[in-house]
Amino acid sequence: GMERYYVEEPWSPINATIKRPEGFVVYEEVDWKPCTEFRGEPVGRYAAYLLEKRGIDHFTAVSKVQSLLRRKVNYAGIKDANAVTYQIIYVDTSGKEPEIKEWEGNGLRLKFLGFIKGKYNHTGNVFEITLDFSDEYTDELRRRIARVADLGRLPAFIGYQRFGTRRPTTHVVGKMLVLREWCNAVDFIL
């Protein structure tokens, strides 16, 4: 598979689960603060929105919002598919008030936050992960969390979870494209 380990420890498996999507929450950071605290300006070229999505892949969400707002959607990063995510998106309104200020449906929620002049300062993402496990693992999990916290940060892992697929074959499709084997690439996608 496409698993990745960033901490070299001889840890044995722990029987824990993450209830998806609610147990995996991602907040985009803007100027080192959660995007839920972001407020735009009274004027600007772009209308900024808070986008909340639940259990929907990024590109499906963007496509739906583009259809709704009838404008190209800009964003700073792709958020996880099987999660609850919060991020800022923005559309060019040439400074005009947007027709839609709030909207909710199909696992998506939009809220107009004001205007921005251009790209905002995306400083990272914050993850809230809720594990379900039996009490026997509490002390061990605390030790492991402390060990990971000592690292200060974890590198970004961009894999199949971003694209909402249960079949992690994007690396194989990429190889087929590089080799110019178009039919094989399509076969792996299908």
Please tell me what each predicted stretch does.
Residues 1-46, 50-56, 64-190:
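Extended, charged/glycine-rich binding lobes that contact polyanionic ligands
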